[in-house]
Swiss-Prot record:
It is an enzyme of class 3 (hydrolase). It comes from Arabidopsis thaliana (Mouse-ear cress). CDD domains: PMEI-like_3 (cd15798). The keyword Disulfide bond applies. PANTHER family: PECTINESTERASE (PTHR31707). The record marks Q379 as: Transition state stabilizer. GO terms for molecular function: enzyme inhibitor activity; pectinesterase activity. It catalyses: [(1->4)-alpha-D-galacturonosyl methyl ester](n) + n H2O = [(1->4)-alpha-D-galacturonosyl](n) + n methanol + n H(+). Pathway: Glycan metabolism; pectin degradation; 2-dehydro-3-deoxy-D-gluconate from pectin: step 1/5. Its EC number is 3.1.1.11. This is Probable pectinesterase/pectinesterase inhibitor 6. GO terms for biological process: cell wall modification; pectin catabolic process. InterPro entries: Invertase/methylesterase_inhib, Pectin_lyas_fold, Pectin_lyase_fold/virulence, Pectinesterase_Asp_AS, Pectinesterase_cat, Pectinesterase_inhib_dom. The lineage of its organism: Eukaryota, Viridiplantae, Streptophyta, Embryophyta, Tracheophyta.
Length: 554
């Protein structure tokens, strides 16, 4: 009897052994996801160079993944600040061509936004900074660098702009942002493991998220009935469903002088000066044609612009690349402030197909919503530049690459009209510009109708990891049997992700589609669900809060 007792370990010893095993396994799972050295990043030599010269460098063999993340992001932010300072000094040179000066001004604004995005991507930034938020910010920063270079491409200055632009510095910053994104993604995966294995003790930064009701992948935005991001107005609930919203407008714009202002930009400028304490500011724009170029800056958040309906309230302009404006600056309406909402407005660029790039609307607004709006143009009509965006019940008209950019965007229940292009042009609906595999970006066209005036392709890859999905759409007869068009030769055909799921209509047959490695006929619900509002856009909280109708599933 006594002998048997000695051979049988006490229950508490079993428990301790099991806990120890779980802890070791948990730590192993956690460490497998972290990036803790430059050699694990996409661009190790750039990482080594800037980390070794960083005043923040405190690396040693014991540096953990979270610390390494913070050091990489901080080093990258230092580079962005230095580059902004350098480019700011270059614009003073009187010998610069006016086109080069235009491109430099774009770069300055984009660097300023990049610094802000890098600041947002730090884990220490605010209690509402989730892993997905941080990846979104860094994806936007990558888009900014690409857009800076595009300004020089617009004017065919890429072969000579090294004379007046710090090209290598810019390239290194772009690579450093890519490194920051890779490290951030790895840290996010580690945080997910930490939630699964709380015994690791690495739950410091994930507790904030789960305490706000966002413990799963599909609820990363921290939205619940009680807790929203600090900039999100607490009163912003079902606002678009309120028939009295226009009567409650803070500012009214009317061409006939019956409102507070006669131009939209005047109202926007006034909005910037009003103390709001995170309240939604509503601008009601009465029916009329407003010939102006409107800019809503990054600092002007939570603005809602409501018109009297499509083709009743019209904002129109004609800036274009041919006449000396960069694609970025050509937008008739440009919005960068987060939380922007538009309803019942037509945004238009009338430059015409012969003027090439001419944007009707550009948006870099995170958590932006466009409801029952129309976007009219030809080449480059709708510039979904960066961040998270949702469009519902909208009409989009164009010819070449007329839905383009590097946002994470879903267009739901929209009508897409491909106009007749110029002679020698080919109609392409999308040109999504995801550049790095770790970016969260892509376009999803869901439950929409595609009508075409001539043969039209669903899209082509503007950048190497372009991602676009058409699902449950009605595709017109003139959609090309091949479906998709190459950009140039074999560029991106293996690294892009193009998908189709459950489409109908005369142009929906996939039997003649391209055979590229990156093209996918999505056959399972599991794969298709990756591209829903809930999973791809994390929109089941922030979109629902606005009152816009939304299908968060398939």
């Amino acid at each position: 009897m006594d002998h048997k007792i000695l051979l049988t370990p006490p229950k508490s010893l079993y428990t301790k052994c099991i806990i120890t095993i779980i802890y070791v396994v948990s730590i192993s799972h956690l460490n497998a996801h972290f990036i803790t050295s430059c050699k694990q990043t996409p661009y190790p030599s750039v990482c080594d160079h800037h980390m070794s010269n960083s005043p923040l460098k405190t690396l040693d063999d014991q540096t953990d993944g979270f610390t390494f993340h913070d050091l990489v992001v901080s080093s990258t932010m230092d580079q962005a600040v230095q580059l902004h300072r350098l480019v700011s000094s270059l614009k003073q040179h009187h010998s610069l061509h006016k086109h080069a000066t235009s491109a430099l001004f774009d770069c300055l604004e984009l660097y300023e936004d990049t610094i802000d995005q890098l600041n947002h991507s730090r884990r220490s930034y605010g209690q509402y900074s989730s892993p997905h938020d941080r990846q979104t910010s860094l994806s936007a920063a990558i888009a900014n660098q690409d857009t800076c270079r595009n300004g020089f491409r617009d004017f065919k200055l890429t072969s000579s702009y090294s004379k007046y632009f710090p090209v290598q510095f810019h390239r290194n910053l772009t690579k450093s942002i890519s490194n920051s994104l890779a490290v951030t993604k790895a840290a996010a995966e580690a945080e997910a493991v930490a939630e699964k294995y709380p015994s690791t003790g690495f739950t410091k930064f994930s507790k904030q998220r789960s305490s706000a009701g966002g413990g799963s992948h599909r609820r990363l935005l921290l939205f619940s009935d009680e807790k929203f991001p600090s900039w999100f107005p607490l009163s912003d609930r079902k606002l678009l469903e309120d028939s009295k919203t226009t009567a409650k407008a803070d500012l009214v714009v009317a061409k006939d002088g019956s409102g507070h202002y006669t131009s939209i930009q005047q109202a926007v400028n006034a909005a910037a000066k009003l103390p709001r304490r995170n309240q939604r500011l509503v601008i009601y724009v009465k029916a009329g044609v407003y010939r102006e170029n409107v800019v809503i800056k990054k600092s002007i958040k939570n603005v809602m612009v409501i018109g009297d309906g499509i083709d009743s309230t019209i904002v129109t302009g004609n800036r274009n690349v041919q006449d000396g404006t960069t694609t970025f600056r050509s937008a008739t309406f440009a919005v960068s402030g987060n939380g922007f909402i538009a309803q019942g407005i037509t945004f238009e660029n009338t430059a015409g197909p012969e003027k090439h790039q001419a944007v009707a609307l550009r948006s870099s607004s995170d958590f932006s919503v466009f409801y029952a709006c129309s976007f009219k143009g030809y080449q480059d009509t709708l510039y979904l530049h960066s961040s998270r965006q949702f469009l519902r019940n909208c009409n989009i008209y164009g010819t070449v690459d007329f839905i383009f950019g590097d946002a994470t965007a879903i267009l739901q229940n929209c009508n897409i009209y491909a106009r007749k292009p110029m002679s020698g042009q080919k109609n392409t609906i999308t040109a999504q510009s995801r550049k790095e595999p770790d970016e969260t970006t892509g376009f999803v066209i869901q439950s929409s109708t595609v009508a075409t005036a001539s043969e039209t392709y669903l899209g082509r890859p503007w950048r190497s990891h372009s991602r676009t999905v058409f699902m449950k759409c009605n595709l017109g007869a003139l959609v090309s049997p091949a479906g998709w068009l190459p950009w140039s030769g074999s560029f991106a055909l293996s690294t892009l992700y193009y998908g189709e799921y459950g489409n109908t209509g005369a142009g929906a047959s996939v039997s003649g589609r391209v055979k590229w490695p990156g093209y996918h006929v999505i056959k399972t619900v599991t794969e298709a669900e990756k591209f829903t509002v809930e999973n791809f856009l994390d929109g089941n909280y922030w979109i629902t809060a606005t009152g816009v109708p939304v299908n968060d599933g398939l």
